[in-house]
């Protein structure tokens, strides 16, 4: 494993440990960012199930997006994940940014999810 990959894995582990310690049993909104797309899942760690998921690859979003790798796509995914979560009865979550900095696409997704009704 390269040094950078090792550091990213450590940061991801550290963030997840803090979430589990202070999350108080709420589901977590996990974000994965690739070079071409962005993905979001709401995961119930106590049961080990994914409650809702959305990505820039969803048919609902693909037609309206220029690309899946920009801030507009992240905002659309954030809004969609919030709508799907509230439909399942989830209103409060813990944001899991993983190893990513809270900046750019990750921040845009979080802000859009907050505006659409998720609390974190």
From Swiss-Prot:
GO MF term list: 5S rRNA binding; structural constituent of ribosome
Record keyword Chloroplast present: no
GO BP annotations listed: translation
GO cellular component: cytosolic large ribosomal subunit
Keywords carried by this UniProt record: Ribonucleoprotein, Ribosomal protein, RNA-binding, rRNA-binding
Keyword field contains Disulfide bond: no
InterPro entries to which the protein is assigned, alphabetical: Ribosomal_uL18_bac-type, Ribosomal_uL18_bac/euk
Protein purpose: This is one of the proteins that bind and probably mediate the attachment of the 5S RNA into the large ribosomal subunit, where it forms part of the central protuberance.
Name of the protein in question: Large ribosomal subunit protein uL18
Species this chain originates from: Rhodospirillum centenum (strain ATCC 51521 / SW)
């Amino acid at each position: 494993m390269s040094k950078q990959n090792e550091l990213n894995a450590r940061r991801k582990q550290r963030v997840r440990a803090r979430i589990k310690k202070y999350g108080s049993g709420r589901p977590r909104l996990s974000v994965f960012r690739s070079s071409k797309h962005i993905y979001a899942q709401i995961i119930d760690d106590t049961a080990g199930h994914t409650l809702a998921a959305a990505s820039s690859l969803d048919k609902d979003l693909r037609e309206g997006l220029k690309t899946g790798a920009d801030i507009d796509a992240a905002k659309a995914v954030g809004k969609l994940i919030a709508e799907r979560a509230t439909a399942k009865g989830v209103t409060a979550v813990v944001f899991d940014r993983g190893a990513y900095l809270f900046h750019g696409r990750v921040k845009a997704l979080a802000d859009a999810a907050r505006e659409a009704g998720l609390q974190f």
